[in-house]
Design a protein with these regions (language model features):
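Acidic/histidine-rich, surface-exposed loop or edge segments in extracytoplasmic proteins
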Residues: 1-3
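Stable alpha-helical elements in mature extracytoplasmic
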Residues: 10-17, 67, 71
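Extended, low-complexity, intrinsically disordered C-terminal regulatory tails
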Residues: 13-41, 81-85
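Catalytic cores and adjacent binding grooves of peptidoglycan-active enzymes
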Residues: 46-102
Length: 102
């Protein structure tokens, strides 16, 4: 799938996911989606295929990877290309695979 189509798919999936989170009682503040620096080499933030979602529940900011497990596992179930950063200690990272990177 070409990059532009993946960016459209990512936008669709992440918006569905955020709505799902709100339905579960979470509140969301969107962090980095597009980045120009400060991320790992080949980060999908550089190509608009990743987002950092800062989650809150009952007014508490959820900073631990484990706090994102329910959300991350749901994200991974949305599409075969969806990857959750909790698999590599970056719990608030949600992305799509592109050319082997996430």
């Amino acid at each position: 799938m070409r990059l532009g189509k993946k960016q459209e798919l990512f936008a669709d999936l992440i918006s569905e996911h955020i709505q799902w989170l709100y339905g579960r009682g979470y509140r969301v503040r969107i962090g980095d989606v597009l980045a120009h620096d400060r991320h790992k080499d080949l980060s999908n933030h550089y190509i608009k295929l990743a987002a950092d979602l800062n989650l809150f529940f009952d007014g508490k900011y959820l900073t631990e990877t484990e706090n994102h497990r329910e959300s991350g596992e749901k994200w991974e179930s949305r599409h075969e290309l969806c990857r959750w950063g909790g698999r590599f200690s970056d719990g608030n990272h949600y992305s799509l695979i592109h050319e082997g990177r996430m």
